[in-house]
Regions:
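Alpha-helix C-terminal capping/helix-to-coil transition sites in glycosyltransferase folds
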Residues: 59-60, 143
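Internal alpha-helical scaffold of NAD(P)-dependent oxidoreductase catalytic cores
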Residues: 53-54, 112-125, 136-171
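Short, charged/polar "capping" segments at the starts of alpha-helices
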Residues: 34-39, 107-109, 153-157
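NAD(P)+-binding Rossmann beta1-loop-alpha1 motif at the extreme N-terminus of oxidoreductases
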Residues: 1-54, 59
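A structural signal for isolated positions on well-ordered beta-strands in alpha/beta enzyme cores
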Residues: 6, 28, 98-100, 123, ...
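Rossmann-like NAD(P)(H) cofactor-binding subdomain of soluble oxidoreductases
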Residues: 71-136
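Structural motif
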Residues: 62-63, 98
Length: 171
């Protein structure tokens, strides 16, 4: 039996994360559109169902990859409200968990979120993606570097998730 992780969002980034980790982990996937990567083990359209299922699994790592859109506002700034909404929902659920944001966000955003969610059990870590939309799955599977930013011990837990799947890639 494999350890499991959860992936929120199944667009080209979330679908790539799902496919890229599927040989190493069971994947609990959530997307409100109902479209999922064929590599997902369990699929949910409701975040609360995803969390309930994930948290009840004996081998769940406590890691949620958040791969959601951050569209550009007219001001040129990223609109992080979709990501923040999901993080807020995750913070309202009991237990210790790590949210790994793969979305484009401005510098300092994870620090702001970690302050906001302090004491809830949720820690936010950033893991930028280096994917091209046309080859996203292959780009994810063939990474030449992995960058993780965030407080310990959460960033260490994310590092272990990547090390298991990509043991030869520098982190």
């Amino acid at each position: 039996m494999k350890l499991s992780i959860s992936v929120v969002g199944q667009g080209f980034v979330g679908g790539s994360v799902t496919a890229g980790f599927s040989k190493t982990y069971d994947i609990n996937a959530c997307d409100i559109s109902g479209k999922f990567s064929d590599s997902a083990t369990n699929c949910f359209v409701d975040l609360h169902e995803l969390v309930s299922n994930s948290e009840s699994q004996e081998l769940f790592t406590g890691v949620y990859f958040v791969c959601l859109p951050t569209p550009m506002r007219q001001s040129g700034m990223c609109d992080v409200s979709i990501v923040e909404s999901v993080l807020t929902q995750l913070s309202n659920i009991s237990g210790t968990r790590t949210a790994v944001v793969k979305s484009t966000i401005p510098p300092g955003t994870t620090a702001k979120w970690n302050e906001k969610f302090k004491g809830t059990g949720l820690t936010v870590v950033f893991n930028p993606e280096f994917l091209t939309e046309a080859n996203a799955v292959e780009d994810f599977k063939n990474q030449n570097r992995i960058i993780i930013g965030g407080p310990r011990p959460a960033s260490g837990a994310v590092k272990r998730v990547f090390e298991s799947a990509f043991p030869k890639v520098p982190i």
